[in-house]
């Protein structure tokens, strides 16, 4: 059961604020709020489940490459179409060169896939990602949002959000949507709407 709410201090609903944020190129949308407050459901309502590519911060506890992780999620091959090697390089140098080529191929293909298919990356529970990955993700997103890549980062308040909010490279490039705790009357609306859909009468 979904209940639309007005964003505190504005005349807009949370849905309208998210729509406005996603319509602005070059900005990263950052949604922060307590657990079970409807942050992910808000994204589903505005973006649509079919257009969302959802990743969790926990997905990067083992996956150390941001773009490879997303590429796997959407089914993009990590292998470069052509792998070049030169006899002038040692085996170690050849391996390094090939990995670098694969990295850029994966990154470019992921960006193209998202733009061509109008997909939006929703990175949920960002605080679960290891600190070093949080910083890397922040740097990666800072670079690609300028290219039309759409992303929403979802996290808890006062947790590990330093990599996003306090990253100097993202200063002026973040649109923050803070979700307030539920009010009693809003919870009552959820119950009333749910009972109505279930055709259950309440006194």
Please state what every model-predicted region is.
Residues 1-26, 112:
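A short, basic N-terminal segment
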Residues 45-51:
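Walker A/P-loop NTP-binding motif
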Residues 77-123, 127-136, 140-150, 154-171, ...:
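Mid-core helix/loop region of P-loop NTP-binding domains shared across ATPases and GTPases
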């Amino acid at each position: 059961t979904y209940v639309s709410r007005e964003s505190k201090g504005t005349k807009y609903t949370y849905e309208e604020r998210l729509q406005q944020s996603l319509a602005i190129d070059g900005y990263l949308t950052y949604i922060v709020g307590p657990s079970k407050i409807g942050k992910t459901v808000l994204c589903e309502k505005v973006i649509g489940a079919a257009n969302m590519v959802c990743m969790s911060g926990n997905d990067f506890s083992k996956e150390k490459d941001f773009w490879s992780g997303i590429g796997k999620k959407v089914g993009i091959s990590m292998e470069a179409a052509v792998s070049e090697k030169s006899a002038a390089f040692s085996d170690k140098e050849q391996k390094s060169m090939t990995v670098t080529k694969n990295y850029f191929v994966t990154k470019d293909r992921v960006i193209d896939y998202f733009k061509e298919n109008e997909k939006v990356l929703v990175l949920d529970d960002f605080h679960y990602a290891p600190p070093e990955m949080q910083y890397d993700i922040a740097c990666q997103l800072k670079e690609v949002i300028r290219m039309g890549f759409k992303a929403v980062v979802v996290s808890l308040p006062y947790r590990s959000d330093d990599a996003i909010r306090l990253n100097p490279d993202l200063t002026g490039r973040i649109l923050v949507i803070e979700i307030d705790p539920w009010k009693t009357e809003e919870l009552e609306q959820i119950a009333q709407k749910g009972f109505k859909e279930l055709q259950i009468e309440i006194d």
